[in-house]
Amino acid sequence: MSVQAQKFNFEDYVYPFGCRTYASPDNKGNLWSVTQYSFESQAYDNYLVEEVYIGHGMMSAKSKYRYHTEENAVISDVQLRQNRLTGSTKYQDKLILFAFPEKDKPFKWTETDRGDKYQCTSEYVYINASIDHNSLFLKSIKMTRDNSYIVENEKHRFIETSYWVSNYGRLITFVDWDGTKKASSKLDVLDYIQEISEEEYNKMKK
């Protein structure tokens, strides 16, 4: 691996403004919940981040993540989830929150999240997005987590796709269950997003 997450200012992608708000729609497109992320500390290579989950206007969970950088990746060492109803649960899985692609090819890895194995990819793509009513053509990092599993002799597939842009952070996350795709979490000021070709991007940037 040739890219260093610290060297390339991963903060510009992860939490560029220190605090971000994401909206999660329900099946009808209505607002279901809001999640807010904020830095609690930014000591070198040791970042403590708090996540507050608000559903139906009430805080229902609070999580704390400690991140460190390792080669291409920003890694979450520990999750501490404080649930309003059930108390605290601690997960020890080491998960990659964000990773830079290699210079000329995707960066791929495998990770285990609470017993489920995911095949993951980080790659550069181009997008057209409207952010706060401004139409922009941007180079983005697309991260994909892919998990196949079998339940009662039936094969299922879960794919999570997120788009990250420097100085904006994570724009949106899509989830695809067995071919049914929907947005699960999006930046509150994101109006729309679509992936475009490099040729179209170069044409519109001229």
PLM segments and residue spans:
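Conserved functional acidic sites
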Residues: 6-206
